[in-house]
Amino acid sequence: MAKKSMIARDVKRKKLVERYAAKRKSLIDAFKSAKDPMERLEIHRKIQALPRNCAPNRIRNRCWATGKPRGVYRDFGLCRNQLRSRAHNGELPGVVKSSW
């Protein structure tokens, strides 16, 4: 199990990303469409003035059962250990142990 403080930090980041998503997208679109270098510099400063944790690439994929940050399968949102144990118990519909 991951530390509760790390899980809480990640939840806080997700909320910030949601709150600033529209503003961040509009600034980035304006930055891409701007031709004048001074205008681009001004828009870039506005983007930098946003909170650091509102960038979506700072969110960490975590297992929803244990909170582990590594070995997480996107399709299930589970870490590899939980995926294996839940698949063996039949808790994941459609997942079967392979044999050939």
Curated annotation (Swiss-Prot):
Record-level Gene Ontology MF annotations: rRNA binding; structural constituent of ribosome
A Pfam match: Ribosomal_S14
Lineage: superkingdom: Bacteria
GO biological process terms, semicolon-separated: translation
UniProt keyword list: Ribonucleoprotein, Ribosomal protein, RNA-binding, rRNA-binding
PROSITE patterns: RIBOSOMAL_S14
Gene Ontology, cellular component aspect: cytoplasm; small ribosomal subunit
HAMAP family documented for this protein: Ribosomal_uS14_1
Subunit structure as annotated in this protein's UniProt entry: Part of the 30S ribosomal subunit. Contacts proteins S3 and S10.
Family affiliation: Belongs to the universal ribosomal protein uS14 family.
Functional note: Binds 16S rRNA, required for the assembly of 30S particles and may also be responsible for determining the conformation of the 16S rRNA at the A site.
Protein name: Small ribosomal subunit protein uS14
